[in-house]
Amino acid sequence: MWRIWRCRLSFLFATGCLLGALTAGLGSQMSDSVGRNVQAPAGVADASQEAGDVVEERTERTEEQVFAPGPPRRHSSESLFPRNASVTARRRRNRRIAPIATAVGVAVILAALYVLRRRRAQPPQEPEPPTRLRTPRPRAPSEQQQPSESEPPAEVPMTPDPLTLRFTCLGDRNVIFFGPSGRQDGFTPLYDPSPSKRVATVDAGTYGLFIGGVGMNGEFADTIIEEARRNRIPLTATELSAESQEIQERLLHDAERQPGTLVEIDSGRFSRVFARSFAYVAIVPNTVWDESETGKNVGATFLHILKPEVTPHGNEMNDVMLYTVAPFGNASDSAYNMAYKATMLGIVGAVSEYNKTPWGEVKPVEAIRLPLLGAGHFRGRRGLHSIGRANAVAVEAAITRFDPRVELQFMYEPSDTALRGLMESERKYKFPQGD
């Protein structure tokens, strides 16, 4: 390393010396140029043609003497014009500048050498920490390596188990936040193999109201089709998509005519997937916000009871799924927040109203497992902080309105946006004067 720096210093030193020499040469050349360009007196211009010829001849002779090789000659008595005093002064000044410029160049090199030696003598310093610390969550029990994500708030302990927090802003209700699982990217499974309670998992669907495609909606389709294949029930992705779309469009038509009421159809009579289907609309889409901003069918929620042949893991506690559509992230803040709140009201309202039905009283839904709605394909240009804040406000409004006796579970997402949003709402609820 020192050899490299020594080569660089030698190059800089040589450059400085060359700069000084060039400065001296430039000063000499400038003075010669000035001497040659001195104008003749006005009287000479008025001389006769004969005098002009003499002047031309003598001028040529003078130029031959000036540009002849050898040391510079002094002006002879035959020179046309005497040397100007200002020219001599400029030449002397330039000759004085040359050694000064050389000395400055050498001084710069010596200063650079001194600084480099000082830095080389100091011990190496630790690199500065990044502006935003990022620490990985603890490994899942499977001991598979998990991706790192943002560090949660200081008051939130980091444990490999699901994080359970009680929120005063939600009526002293416990909320579970899942950590990374052993699956790809650490995502939470839709359903557990051996659940202790009946969980309804929310499918973040699409504006077309069908099950399938990409993302979480595609994962639901794959899970249902795999269970059907295991039980030797012929079911393709195209058939599932068409069947789910037809049922949910029929339900939405009925629910929009009766907002705030749980509507149902006996889908088990003609469906290979659903035993019974319900829909709930808290706010009719496109009445409070513009669907051209948020997307179609936002705010409607569908609750399906799956048939045993397609129930995940074959466990009857996993036979409930919820389907909803989040607003498009590029919508205006007012339209987005209103549509997001209507979506959460639809989810919690559908479960709350279902638990009041004869089927729900016998076998109620005990927990709702949610992704961070709107953070995937339909996020657009909206930031995660904005989504987390909208989610927290919507959850608080839904719990306050329906007060359901269910547990809320948020699926793992690396940014912990849902957790951060609810923690912010909790601080505002406890310390309203601080805002």
Curated annotation (Swiss-Prot):
Stretches with biased composition (Low complexity): 141-153
Keywords, sorted A to Z: Membrane, Signal, Tachyzoite, Transmembrane, Transmembrane helix
Sequence segments annotated as region (Disordered): 43-88, 120-162
Endpoints of the signal sequence: 1-20
One cellular component (GO) term of this entry: membrane
Domain of life of the native organism: Eukaryota
Chief place where the protein resides: membrane
Topological domains annotated Cytoplasmic: 117-435
Residue ranges of the TM segments: 96-116
Stretches in topological domain Vacuolar: 21-95
Membrane topology: Single-pass type I membrane protein
Subcellular location per the Swiss-Prot or TrEMBL entry: Parasitophorous vacuole membrane
Sequence ranges of Basic and acidic residues compositional bias: 55-64
SUBUNIT field: Interacts with host SAMM50.
Known function: During host cell infection by tachyzoites, does not play a role in tethering the parasitophorous vacuole to the host mitochondria, probably because it does not bind host mitochondrial import protein TOMM70.
Protein name according to UniProt: Mitochondrial association factor 1 form a1
Lineage, uppermost ranks: Eukaryota, Sar, Alveolata, Apicomplexa, Conoidasida
